[in-house]
From Swiss-Prot:
The keyword Transport does not apply. This is Large ribosomal subunit protein uL6. GO terms for cellular component: cytosolic large ribosomal subunit. It comes from Actinobacillus succinogenes (strain ATCC 55618 / DSM 22257 / CCUG 43843 / 130Z). One of its GO terms (biological process) is cytoplasmic translation. NCBIfam families: L6_bact (TIGR03654). Keywords: Ribonucleoprotein, Ribosomal protein, RNA-binding, rRNA-binding. GO terms for molecular function: rRNA binding; structural constituent of ribosome. Belongs to the universal ribosomal protein uL6 family. This protein binds to the 23S rRNA, and is important in its secondary structure. It is located near the subunit interface in the base of the L7/L12 stalk, and near the tRNA binding site of the peptidyltransferase center.
Amino acid sequence: MSRVAKAPVNIPAGVQVSLNGQLLTVKGKNSELSRTIHNSVEVKEDNGALTFAPREGFAGADAQAGTARALVNAMVIGVTEGFTKKLQLVGVGYRAQVKGNSISLNLGFSHPVEHTLPAGITAECPSQTEIVLKGADKQLIGQVAADIRAYRKPEPYKGKGVRYADEVVRTKEAKKK
């Protein structure tokens, strides 16, 4: 069994977990998340904790058990605390503005780019060059952040573009004469 799957997922107070076949639903004060667990993984709830074990006769069941445990742990953290992802806009005239359920980005194109946020994700702009994404679903936040970054990735010579707040952009030296 994988080392990750051996550790149980503790369920904090105020979080309800329901298991219906292979469909696991986690409800918390912030939101509710559901996920279908792979058939090769057996999930048990006892004493306020979820345990994951591989089923016999499935190839790769050990790996699936570890993956399922990590995904469910992220769900529990998401419904209790939530996740945040910060983006920075680097470049002259690069700006972001939140308009209801979408973000308007000025990224040097001839037109502003409108990015509609999916349900469950909120955005705020503490300054014109910063975007903070918040939500309960870790995978969805990462996907939205990657989609926004893909509009204008950091270029390697000046570092202009949309980058994650903790990202270090390696810059190249300019061509010498």
